Amino acid sequence: MVNKSRMMPAVLAVAVVVAFLTTGCIRWSTQSRPVVNGPAAAEFAVALRNRVSTDAMMAHLSKLQDIANANDGTRAVGTPGYQASVDYVVNTLRNSGFDVQTPEFSARVFKAEKGVVTLGGNTVEARALEYSLGTPPDGVTGPLVAAPADDSPGCSPSDYDRLPVSGAVVLVDRGVCPFAQKEDAAAQRGAVALIIADNIDEQAMGGTLGANTDVKIPVVSVTKSVGFQLRGQSGPTTVKLTASTQSFKARNVIAQTKTGSSANVVMAGAHLDSVPEGPGINDNGSGVAAVLETAVQLGNSPHVSNAVRFAFWGAEEFGLIGSRNYVESLDIDALKGIALYLNFDMLASPNPGYFTYDGDQSLPLDARGQPVVPEGSAGIERTFVAYLKMAGKTAQDTSFDGRSDYDGFTLAGIPSGGLFSGAEVKKSAEQAELWGGTADEPFDPNYHQKTDTLDHIDRTALGINGAGVAYAVGLYAQDLGGPNGVPVMADRTRHLIAKP
């Protein structure tokens, strides 16, 4: 999971249904089962939910931990640990009778540490632009040359016609042209590095030069005030930056039931990769285990109205690359054929919360990740809120902030939702009172660390949230209608997602 999320209490619009926990499993009497999309669908959903056990999900997590242990403690894309994770999921699905696809995609991953600019004995912090070159350990040094300050500074080599740019470190203000154009103009005139001064005084802006740009020199950004200070000075200037770009190929894993309408596909996904720093057993082995066990228990040819497609994404931790690549590969008809997408990323945090994605947009405007989410997402949220009520948990919202693999689907207009147990954000006192756990501590103190191991999985959260995967999949596999349904084919609006 990437980026930070903001969480607020959800507006609950469902009746409380009595439930109880028994040895890590949740059981409901016939009378307490919720009628959401119809009684037959609810019966099927509860039956599927009851077949997805905590022990089975823990067994999948144990396998993923073993894979990480055998591969330098990681399952990150581009490592043998990721390849072994793909093989495990593929073999498990094939052993359950699924036809499995492993579409390959290419990506470039940029990594950088904070850079510095030194002039006249003073050092200031700078931020690499994505896909910048790095410098040698001692940096690159040259006289500081400032481009003219105008509406389009440094956008053309001619902007430097009367300036001694060759061998210099060039300072240019942010303007109307792309950063890659500024880099190219300075590089053509022989600059050894480029500093771009932002037009605001917040954090250094970052930005990208573009994955397909032939970058020739290091490029960093500084704030407006730092840029102003630099512009008033002269003399030898050194830029230091540790940065690299890695190109790789990776695979997603896709499997679909052989039964059910292919014009109304219910899609459930979880990212399969970890960060390089750790094994990723909560983030996101927990989501993988829940989706995988749901597939195993549903089977390859269930008696369902709508086909179910299971997805295990690669390179989420490097910017949602696998899922975004998949959505970009689909035409309008294929996008319309996906009735909804359910995303499961971090379900068993050790200090867990019980969050649903904010499909009804009940968060305050400034807390929403997207100004609008696709029609139908509110119904999905209500389904998960109702499920958590059954499990004895009161849901709170987490925003659609582009943090996980739902992002490409929502941008394409596909109704989306899911469950989430929290990451690096600290649990409030009110949340600790609501759910238990420790206030003022992160939901997952092991987030993106080597300590994200099997030993730190919360079994109760895994049992509740993992069962929620099966419940929602089973419900929508049988019925897409009702108050918590999604638009029918004729009413679906979809958008092509362009490749960068």
UniProtKB/Swiss-Prot annotation:
Signal peptide stretch: 1-24
Swiss-Prot/TrEMBL keywords: Aminopeptidase, Cell membrane, Hydrolase, Lipoprotein, Membrane, Metal-binding, Palmitate, Protease, Signal, Zinc
A single GO molecular function term of this UniProt record: metal ion binding
Family annotation (CDD domains): M28_SGAP_like, PA_SaNapH_like
Gene Ontology CC terms, in alphabetical order: extracellular region; plasma membrane
Topology of this chain in the membrane: Lipid-anchor
Pfam families: PA, Peptidase_M28
Assigned EC number: 3.4.11.1
Annotated lipid attachment (N-palmitoyl cysteine): C25
UniProt main location, coarse: membrane
Active site: E316
Domain PA intervals: 140-231
Site (Transition state stabilizer): Y447
GO annotation terms (biological process): proteolysis
Transmembrane region(s): none
Binding site residues for Zn(2+) 2: D283, E317, H448
EC supergroup of this enzyme: hydrolase
Catalytic activity: Release of an N-terminal amino acid, Xaa-|-Yaa-, in which Xaa is preferably Leu, but may be other amino acids including Pro although not Arg or Lys, and Yaa may be Pro. Amino acid amides and methyl esters are also readily hydrolyzed, but rates on arylamides are exceedingly low
Sequence positions that bind Zn(2+) 1: H271, D283, D345
Modification note: Modified by Lgt on Cys-25 with an S-linked diacylglycerol with a mixture of C16 and C19 fatty acids (palmitic and tuberculostearic acid), signal peptide is removed by LspA, modified by Lnt with an amide-linked mixture of C16 and C19 fatty acids, expressed in M.bovis.
Cofactor: Zn(2+)
Cofactor note: Binds 2 Zn(2+) ions per subunit.
Protein family: Belongs to the peptidase M28 family. M28A subfamily.
Function as written in the Swiss-Prot or TrEMBL entry: An aminopeptidase; acts on free N-terminal amino groups with a very strong preference for Leu in the first position.
Name of the protein described by the UniProt record: Probable lipoprotein aminopeptidase LpqL
Organism: Mycobacterium tuberculosis (strain ATCC 25618 / H37Rv)
Upper taxonomic lineage: Bacteria, Bacillati, Actinomycetota, Actinomycetes, Mycobacteriales
Gene: lpqL
